[in-house]
Amino acid sequence: MNIFRFAGDMSHLISVLILLLKIYATKSCAGISLKTQELYALVFLTRYLDLFTDYVSLYNSIMKIVFIASSLAIVWCMRRHPLVRRSYDKDLDTFRHQYVVLACFVLGLILNEKFTVQEVFWAFSIYLEAVAILPQLVLLQRSGNVDNLTGQYVVFLGAYRGLYIINWIYRYFTEDHFTRWIACVSGLVQTALYADFFYYYYISWKTNTKLKLPA
């Protein structure tokens, strides 16, 4: 494992910890898209089908468990916690994510590296992760104002994907037969979706003003 992948994993982990901190410390999920969190839970559940069959390393197994458990915990809190669920912005979180799931599953069936159950679901999870942030970005755009923790959560998610792109470039030039083209293309799409948010986040940071997204 190279430094770029490790840094990407840590950025991803930090984003999850920030979101958990926001939910548990404030007992609020205002500004957070439940639909995005459900998509991420589905991403991890389908990507890590090999958790109990293919052992790579202790680090790898721990990270898989952490991301599965944390994504399910976040969804549970937003749906079931008596205090947290009251703050859910249901009226703003209206992105029709079921169509995204269907489209990504069809893509997984058609475009995969090997037509097996595990590889089809792996491809599906990669495609789905690329667009899972869409409901969150739409919700933030509709609400206008973005609180500090939510903004940092999205920034670290974007940093995670950006670092993974550097990781793939590094592996392409240093490893023989590196052909994860599905992950590379999907990663570029995912990073592009963050571009607008990063621009306004930078402007907010530079001017020391509250982050606001145009409607």
From Swiss-Prot:
It is a multi-pass membrane protein. GO terms for biological process: protein retention in ER lumen; protein transport; vesicle-mediated transport. Belongs to the ERD2 family. It comes from Arabidopsis thaliana. Keywords: Endoplasmic reticulum, ER-Golgi transport, Membrane, Protein transport, Receptor, Transmembrane, Transmembrane helix, Transport. PANTHER family: ER LUMEN PROTEIN RETAINING RECEPTOR. It comes from the Eukaryota. It is found in: Endoplasmic reticulum membrane. The chain crosses the membrane at residues 3-21, 36-53, 62-82, 99-112, 120-139, 152-170, 182-202. Residues 22-35, 83-98, 140-151, 203-215 are cytoplasmic. The keyword S-adenosyl-L-methionine does not apply. Residues 1-2, 54-61, 113-119, 171-181 are lumenal. This is ER lumen protein-retaining receptor A. InterPro entries: ER_ret_rcpt (IPR000133). The lineage of its organism: Eukaryota, Viridiplantae, Streptophyta, Embryophyta, Tracheophyta. GO terms for cellular component: cis-Golgi network; endoplasmic reticulum; endoplasmic reticulum membrane; Golgi apparatus. One of its GO terms (molecular function) is ER retention sequence binding. Required for the retention of luminal endoplasmic reticulum proteins. Determines the specificity of the luminal ER protein retention system. Also required for normal vesicular traffic through the Golgi. This receptor recognizes H-D-E-L.
